């Protein structure tokens, strides 16, 4: 009887261990599912964050005015149209909305080593000043009388000749003879500075004279 009772109770002791194993496997599966969901959620949040930053960056760049737009505003009501003529006679035009890599002077970096380069600058406004920078301005004359077109011949630091054709009207008081070379402009600035110093010395001398005259009385 005791052996039969012992054999009958033995399966009852095995059953709880199997149930514990099943519960443990279920818990592990739930934890793995939760962890995978958390990783997916973090990945989605990171993608949304990166996409928001990139969208804001594109929006800021779209709102920022371009250099071409600023140049158009400074040029006036009409656009600035530039044409380049090389030695072969071919011409190329560049508009403010184009993708040509030219600056305000219309100099193409690809043709900077050419012997000569002729440029036409069409301005719908008034030419206020003509400045050559390091280039020495040699000549300015009318291409044809009455057509408001002026040709400026300039020589660069590398002894290359450049001719600029300006279409427009010169302001009042500015003619062909009033445009001087950089050397003449430097001399004029020196002369004005010396005249200003002379006037300051005279004013100081007069002030000292009046002060001395007042102290004597």
Swiss-Prot record:
Family: Belongs to the bZIP family.
Protein name per the record: Cyclic AMP-responsive element-binding protein
Annotated spans, Basic motif: 191-211
Annotated InterPro entries: bZIP, CREB1-like_pKID, Leuzip_CREB
Domain notes: In contrast to other proteins of the family, the C-terminus is shorter and lacks the leucine-zipper.
Subunit structure and binding partners: Binds DNA as a dimer.
Molecular function GO terms recorded: DNA-binding transcription factor activity, RNA polymerase II-specific; RNA polymerase II cis-regulatory region sequence-specific DNA binding
One cellular component term from this protein's GO annotations in UniProt: transcription regulator complex
Protein localization: Nucleus
Summary of the function given for this chain in its UniProt record: This protein binds the cAMP response element (CRE), a sequence present in many viral and cellular promoters. Could regulate the transcriptional activity of genes involved in regeneration processes.
Keyword terms of this UniProt record: DNA-binding, Nucleus, Transcription, Transcription regulation
Domain annotation KID: ranges: 34-93
Gene3D superfamilies listed in its UniProt record: 1.20.5.170
Low complexity compositional bias, start-end: 89-109
A Pfam family it matches: pKID
Region of interest (Disordered), ranges: 73-109
Listed transmembrane segments: none
Keyword DNA-binding on entry: yes
């Amino acid at each position: 009887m005791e052996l039969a009772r012992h054999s009958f109770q033995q399966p009852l002791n095995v059953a709880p261990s199997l149930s514990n194993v099943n519960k443990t496997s279920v818990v592990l599966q739930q934890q793995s599912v939760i962890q995978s969901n958390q990783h997916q959620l973090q990945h989605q949040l990171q993608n949304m964050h990166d996409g928001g930053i990139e969208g804001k960056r594109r929006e800021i760049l779209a709102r920022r005015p371009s250099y071409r737009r600023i140049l158009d505003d400074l040029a006036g009501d009409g656009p600035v149209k530039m044409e380049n003529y090389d030695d072969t006679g071919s011409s190329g035009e560049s508009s403010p909305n184009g993708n040509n890599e030219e600056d305000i002077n219309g100099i193409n970096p690809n043709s900077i080593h050419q012997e000569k380069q002729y440029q036409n600058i069409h301005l719908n406004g008034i030419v206020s000043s003509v400045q050559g920078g390091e280039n020495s301005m040699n000549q300015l004359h009318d291409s044809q009388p009455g057509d408001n077109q002026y040709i400026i011949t300039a020589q660069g630091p590398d002894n290359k000749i450049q001719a600029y054709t300006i279409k427009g009207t010169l302001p009042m008081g500015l003619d062909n003879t009033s445009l001087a070379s950089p050397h003449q402009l430097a001399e004029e600035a020196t002369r004005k500075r010396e005249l200003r110093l002379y006037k300051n010395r005279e004013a100081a001398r007069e002030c000292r004279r009046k002060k001395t005259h007042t102290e004597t009385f």
